[in-house]
A protein has these predicted regions:
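A generic secondary-structure signal for well-formed alpha-helical elements
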Residues: 103, 110, 138-142, 180, ...
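Short runs of predominantly hydrophobic/aromatic residues within well-ordered alpha helices
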Residues: 130-131, 163-173, 196, 273-280, ...
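Internal, conserved structured core segments that host functional sites
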Residues: 145-203, 207
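Conserved nucleotide- and phosphate/pyrophosphate-binding catalytic cores
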Residues: 191, 197-366
Length: 366
């Protein structure tokens, strides 16, 4: 293959992705307008892998929007995707603790178990069984083209496993088992929703033309800003640059104090030239609702010490109510387990019904 041919292929893929994003953005805006008028007509599925504790990036990137959707009256579901932990990890150590801490943080942030079903992947076998018919609806080439699979494989440093390759199809099972028609996501996760739409469409066309079984879900594209870690890199638990929602005030202060800055005394907001200082300003701006540039102007020549002091005070003030609610909930872990057991029970009822509809459509009821 010549360099020119490779360049043409890269350009074609880029144009295809750009067109796909524009179509998804248009669909997202139209769906949001309908959702505002009739939230009861929408079912949302979202979730997290229990690979560690939730941090500020999770809150501003997704959890805040989940709470808002729930409170609007959208039928809300949150999956704790424990099976998906092993897509790029060789151990399930700490998974019990991680799962329970997710539920604690969800509820402390405002997720109401009476309005939102929280459940774990591994506890809903009928949902996972959908993977078999769904895999027949996609090609190997389509799976290999998924950019999220590529990036996850590169980040993990592992060989490509069958579970990682089929990760997007497993996510389609998560979304479609409860007939979710809206999925709040960031731009990076759009390919997962697109392949879910493809699977739903192909299943209905192949097996259920007269009575479609699955909706084609719309991605609700997040308007949340990308939140950098305290060192200016992407916020990640593995980098140790994240402010955990459940961290104490002292732990938070210690983390912020040791975050890197630069040699310039005057504080300015410049994410490209000064990523580390700008990351601290962005964090302060999010938790206070202020423009990071205004904060930088206010601190001025007072230097990095004054900036870190401001960030510590702002973050701790913002997280204080969350910590208080979390501590109160943590006094009764049996209740937290009951919430999860109840969610698992409800999810099984829904998944069993959906699987029966799938078997009926495929002529596999005996």
């Amino acid at each position: 293959m010549t360099d020119e041919t490779q360049e043409q292929q890269i350009t074609a893929v880029g144009n295809e992705m750009s067109a796909s994003f524009l179509a998804a953005k248009k669909r997202s805006n139209a769906t949001l307008a309908k959702l505002e008028e009739h939230p009861e007509k929408f079912t949302m599925l979202t979730g997290d892998r229990p690979t560690g504790r939730l941090h500020l990036g999770h809150y501003f990137g997704s959890i805040r929007e989940r709470v808002a959707m729930q409170n609007r009256g959208v039928n809300s579901n949150i999956i704790i995707a424990d099976y998906q932990v092993i897509t790029d990890r060789d151990t399930t150590e700490h998974i019990q603790d991680n799962v329970l801490n997710l539920v604690l943080d969800y509820m402390a942030a405002g997720i109401d178990p009476n309005k939102t079903m929280m459940f774990t992947h591994s506890a809903v076998p009928a949902e996972n069984q959908l993977l078999l018919p769904f895999l027949s609806l996609v090609t190997e080439a389509e799976l290999h083209r998924n950019p999220t699979v590529k990036s996850e494989m590169e980040a993990s440093g592992h060989a490509l496993t069958g579970l990682l390759l089929t990760y997007p199809v497993h996510q389609a099972c998560d979304i479609l088992f409860c007939k979710a028609n809206v999925v709040p996501i960031g731009k990076d996760n759009l390919p997962h929703v697109e392949i879910t739409r493809t699977i739903a469409r192909r299943f209905n066309e192949r097996y259920a033309k007269k009575n479609p079984v699955f909706p084609e879900p719309a991605a609700i594209l997040s308007e949340a800003p990308e939140i950098p870690g305290l060192d200016g890199r992407k916020m990640s638990k593995s980098y140790g640059n994240s402010i955990m929602l459940g961290a104490t005030a002292e732990e938070t202060a210690k983390l912020i104090k040791k975050s890197p800055t630069d040699s310039e005394r005057r504080i300015t907001f410049d994410p490209i030239a000064r990523p580390q200082v700008s990351a601290l300003l962005t964090t302060a701006g999010l938790v206070t609702g202020r423009d990071p540039k205004d904060i930088a102007e206010e601190i001025g020549d007072s230097g990095a010490g004054a900036l870190k002091k401001y960030v510590i005070e702002s973050v701790n003030e913002f997280l204080a109510p969350h910590r208080e609610r979390r501590a109160e909930l943590a006094k009764d872990m049996d209740y937290i387990r009951d919430v999860l057991h109840d969610g698992n029970k409800r999810a099984n009822e829904i998944a069993n019904e959906t699987l029966e509809q799938v078997r009926e459509a495929m002529g596999m009821r005996y």
